């Protein structure tokens, strides 16, 4: 910041003018985003910070502090940010949470305190959180003795949704959930006088973290993801396709109103620009290969959606067909599939009166083939082969995911069932491991899910904490199976499948601002992983194998 060092009448004039500015305006002008943070008008994300940013609150609704070095959460530590609705405190160094630590946060709904080095949580640490709906304490293991009684009672009384609190001891409670403990009445009563020291101990909760296995995984990886290339623009979706032995990538860029097509450069060993399809608020670019023809469905929020075809004489994509605006108002996803050697695609419509529609190729063009349910604001569509039968799974903001089955007689999709107890699912993706069908279901806040088909229904395999997730994408490179879980509030997580435990384990954290899609691309015996970013730069990671013998 430059300081005024001049004197005279001009200096006095500037000083007088400054005094006329309201104090709040002066503070707002001086406010800066700390070097360790990333700030927008509504959110702050800090990595490795030693303090809570003292930024003028404005409309700040979410604050994320990750890998911080501060040692305690003091009383009223966040009271200068009264508009907070989400507070994420993950993988920090603090050991103590004091009484009234979150005082002043009357609108806080989501509080995540996972994977820290907590030793003590004061009895009144959560006092004043009247609007709290979600609390997550995972990554901490509790000694479920008398010192945990206050938390046990609080869990019984709170209306908030609280993650499972697992007990590490004593032996009779080991691996049990704290809220499933019968009672502390017998263990925590005495006929003798209770000393002040005993009372103080009863107000504290001792935790111990068991990170040995996790540290081992990170110290001895067999593979890794490293940044290969950074693209200087925002994006919301990435699709890949092959044509004539070359690999291409289509990237939707709504802010630049482009569908950028990249090709792999075999000489420079990176992805370079090949063509650019312009439009209005493009949210999706989906490639369709039919015989020797290459089409790209370009979904737009305004001006209708269109289909482009690659013209070899012009060596570029040219408009081939319009998609009527009356059917698709707010496209949110495009899914390509084949049934009986015929090519279809579906556009999920997320508008209030949306009408998700299936389109079919008829050798001359694509025409609307079947309109699915309306008024459900569909956010995603996934084509799935279940026991040899074709199905569509539609996720929606207004109901649980529904399953439609292809009727061979009518050659239309008909309702077949749903996935119960899975409200607010944004996206559904299918994948297979060892011939077993799995689904990944994305939730923005709460828990995303991995589910498995057991020949009768989909059953839960694993819950993954979601912190502002818009995508949970499965992908594989050779025998390595991964899940990428995006986050708008902290690091995105890459999970790797553990064959022995039959679950996904945390493998690596990557930082991508507001990730919207993850896409695997392989070429020249190299494997890449595109991470689109709605608010920052699009990143391309390379999957590498680490030789531990070196």
Curated annotation (Swiss-Prot):
Pfam families in the cross-refs: EPTP, LRR_8
Statement: the UniProt record of this protein carries the keyword Repeat: yes
Domain LRRNT: 26-62
LRRCT domain ranges (all copies): 140-190
Positions annotated as LRR repeat: 83-104, 107-128
GO cellular component terms given for this protein: extracellular space
Protein name: Leucine-rich repeat LGI family member 2
Gene source species: Mus musculus (Mouse)
């Amino acid at each position: 910041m430059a300081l005024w060092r001049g004197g005279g009448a001009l200096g006095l004039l500037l000083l007088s003018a400054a005094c006329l500015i309201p104090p709040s305006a002066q503070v707002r002008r001086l406010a800066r985003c700390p070097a360790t943070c990333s700030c927008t008008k509504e959110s702050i994300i800090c990595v490795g910070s030693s303090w809570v940013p003292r930024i003028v609150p404005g409309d700040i609704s979410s604050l994320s502090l990750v890998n911080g070095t501060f040692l305690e959460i003091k009383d009223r530590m966040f009271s200068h940010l009264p508009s907070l609705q989400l507070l994420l405190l993950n993988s920090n160094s603090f050991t103590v949470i004091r009484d009234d630590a979150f005082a002043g946060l009357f609108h806080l709904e989501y509080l995540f305190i996972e994977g820290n080095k907590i030793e003590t949580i004061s009895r009144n640490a959560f006092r004043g959180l009247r609007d709290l709906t979600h609390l997550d304490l995972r990554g901490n293991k509790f000694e479920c003795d008398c010192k945990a009684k206050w938390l046990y009672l609080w869990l019984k009384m709170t209306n908030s949704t609280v993650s499972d609190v697992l007990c590490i001891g004593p032996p009779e409670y080991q691996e049990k959930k704290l809220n499933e403990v019968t009672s502390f009445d017998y263990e925590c009563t005495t006929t003798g006088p209770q000393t002040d020291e005993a009372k103080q101990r009863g107000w504290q909760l001792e935790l111990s973290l068991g990170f040995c296995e996790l540290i081992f995984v990170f110290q001895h990886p067999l593979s890794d993801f490293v940044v290969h290339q950074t693209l200087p623009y925002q994006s919301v979706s990435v699709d890949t396709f092959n044509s004539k032995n070359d690999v291409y990538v289509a990237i939707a860029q709504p802010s630049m109103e482009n569908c950028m097509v990249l090709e792999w450069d075999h000489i420079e060993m990176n992805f370079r620009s090949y063509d650019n399809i312009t439009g209005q608020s493009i949210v999706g670019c989906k490639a369709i290969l039919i015989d020797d023809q290459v089409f790209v469905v370009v979904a737009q929020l305004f001006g209708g959606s269109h289909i482009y075809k690659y013209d070899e004489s012009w060596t570029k994509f040219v408009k081939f067909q319009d998609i009527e605006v009356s059917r698709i108002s707010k496209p949110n996803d495009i899914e390509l599939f084949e049934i009986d050697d015929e090519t279809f695609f579906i556009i999920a419509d997320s508008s209030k009166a949306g009408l998700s529609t299936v389109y079919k190729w008829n050798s001359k063009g694509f025409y609307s083939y079947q309109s699915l349910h309306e008024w459900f604001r569909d956010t995603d569509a996934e084509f799935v082969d279940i026991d040899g039968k074709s199905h569509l799974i539609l996720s929606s903001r207004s109901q649980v995911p529904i399953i439609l089955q292809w009727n061979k007689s009518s050659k239309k999709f008909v309702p077949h069932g749903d996935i119960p107890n899975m409200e607010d699912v944004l996206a559904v993706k299918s994948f297979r491991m060892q011939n077993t069908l799995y689904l990944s279901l994305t939730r923005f806040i709460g828990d995303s899910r991995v589910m498995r088909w057991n020949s009768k229904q989909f059953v839960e395999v694993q819950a993954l904490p979601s912190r502002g997730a818009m995508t949970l994408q499965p992908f594989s490179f050779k025998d390595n199976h991964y899940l990428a879980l995006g986050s708008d509030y902290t690091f995105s997580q890459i999970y790797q499948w553990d064959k022995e435990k039959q679950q996904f384990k945390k493998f690596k954290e990557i930082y991508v601002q507001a990730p919207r899609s993850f896409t695997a691309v392989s070429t020249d015996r190299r494997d890449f992983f595109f991470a689109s970013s709605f608010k920052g730069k699009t990143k391309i990671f390379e999957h590498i194998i680490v030789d531990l013998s070196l």
